[in-house]
């Protein structure tokens, strides 16, 4: 009986391990069919967007950083502080704080502003293929610096996206190999289930043999 109990525990443990393995296979199949391809598609579009926007900026931004030109409203500004001041004025004059409003253009990118009511901040979006967002502060010149930092940061974000894409592609290839692997303890589980079935059969036979036969007494 003790052997039967020990074997039953081992079989239950192996069955639980197999159920976990099966669940893992289902997750891998789901990732292979949907999740990884979707992530790859999004990252490829993001990479293409960064590449396009970086090329737009390269073509439209003068090599000489002192040669500044920004359109705000209907005016062209060549002074950074004046351009930054005009941006703040445009923010203050916005009719609706709930909608994104286009206020100008810089380096071939549309400049759009919206109000983040949760953080109580104005947010500028440089819009090309992608939207490149940053918070506006109260310093006119500082906002122009922030804008340039966003443009300069595109290369780093492109590199991050490319690294993520390579990682997801690697995860997809790994998942395709892992999903082919059978449950490693399948043979052991089958063997112990057969042993347990044999022990159960023997125990049932012993119980039947030990059951006393009660004969009916003759009726007088």
Q: Positions of the model-derived regions?
A:
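Short, surface-exposed, charged/polar-biased interaction segments
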Residues: 42, 49, 64, 189, ...
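C-terminal helical accessory/scaffold domains
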Residues: 56-120
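C-terminal accessory region of SF2 helicases/translocases
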Residues: 1-77
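Mid-to-C-terminal oligomerization/interaction "stalk" domains of large proteins
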Residues: 2-31, 95-206
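Intrinsically disordered, low-complexity mixed-charge segments
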Residues: 206-214
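Non-Sec secretion/translocation targeting segments of pathogen effectors
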Residues: 214-220
